[in-house]
């Protein structure tokens, strides 16, 4: 299956880690957004929203990283796969964490940092407070269980790991978040695809410094 991606993208990295966990080989197609490759007609035919990651599986195209992660487990995972178990309550908690990562954790990071390195704007203290608030919520979640959505690793961990490792590489101070650090230190080198995730983080760091 074809996978259109950019290594520095946290959402792309979360899909790569999911594929690794499932033993799926992705046909990776680098798409350089900085050179406008996502706006070429051939890619717009695949994804008119022109976003990454984008997956094409036997002619079926989809995007949005967390939707791709769920699709991969539902189609290629084991029955009642621990990454995304069939129990409605367990799935609901995983979904909650995935949506929290997308709509609160990663969004607050992006809202705070992107204007600084994309538009050279000064840091906004109010936006930083929102980012800290998101980290505090995550710290609470991780005080209640070993992993992000229970006692075993799930898709929620892979998505949030892609986010938190990005925070780490750009030197966001996580030292006061005891439970995030415990969880992060447990997974950062051992999660499926951890090495490729970190390599992508280092690419992100280069862009962040420009």
From Swiss-Prot:
Q: Which residues form the GST N-terminal domain?
A: 1-80
Q: Which reaction does it catalyse?
A: RX + glutathione = an S-substituted glutathione + a halide anion + H(+)
Enumerate the PROSITE patterns for this protein: GST_CTER, GST_NTER
List residues binding glutathione.
9, 50-52, 64-66
Enzyme class at the top of the EC tree? transferase
Domain (GST C-terminal): give its ranges: 87-208
**Keywords associated with the record:** Transferase
What's a single GO MF annotation on this record? glutathione transferase activity
InterPro entries linked: Glutathione-S-Trfase_C-like, Glutathione-S-Trfase_C_sf, Glutathione_S-Trfase, Glutathione_S-Trfase_N, GST_C, Thioredoxin-like_sf
Cited SUPFAM superfamilies: GST C-terminal domain-like, Thioredoxin-like
Give the record's GO biological process terms.
glutathione metabolic process
Q: What is its EC number?
A: 2.5.1.18
Q: Which family does it belong to?
A: Belongs to the GST superfamily. Theta family.
Q: Subunit structure of this entry?
A: Homodimer.
Q: What does this protein do?
A: Conjugation of reduced glutathione to a wide number of exogenous and endogenous hydrophobic electrophiles.
Report the protein name in the record: Glutathione S-transferase 3
| Species per Swiss-Prot/TrEMBL record | Musca domestica
């Amino acid at each position: 299956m074809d996978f259109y991606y950019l290594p520095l993208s946290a959402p792309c990295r979360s899909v790569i880690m999911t594929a690794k966990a499932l033993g799926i080989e992705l046909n990776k197609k680098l798409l350089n957004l900085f050179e406008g490759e996502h706006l070429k007609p051939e890619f717009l035919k695949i994804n008119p929203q022109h976003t990454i990651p984008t997956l094409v599986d036997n002619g079926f195209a989809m995007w949005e990283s967390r939707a791709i992660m769920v699709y991969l487990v539902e189609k290629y995972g084991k029955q009642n796969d621990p990454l995304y178990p069939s129990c409605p309550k367990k799935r609901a908690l995983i979904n909650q964490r995935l949506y929290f990562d997308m709509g609160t954790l990663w969004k607050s990071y992006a809202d705070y940092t992107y204007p600084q390195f994309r538009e050279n704007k000064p840091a906004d203290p109010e936006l930083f407070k929102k980012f800290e608030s998101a980290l505090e919520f995550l710290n609470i979640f991780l005080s209640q269980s070993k992993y992000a959505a229970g006692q075993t690793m799930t898709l929620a961990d892979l998505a949030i790991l892609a986010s938190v490792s990005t925070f780490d590489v750009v030197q966001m101070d996580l030292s006061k978040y005891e439970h995030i650090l415990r969880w992060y230190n447990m997974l950062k080198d051992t999660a499926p695809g951890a090495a490729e995730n970190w390599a992508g983080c280092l690419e992100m760091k280069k862009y962040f410094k420009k």
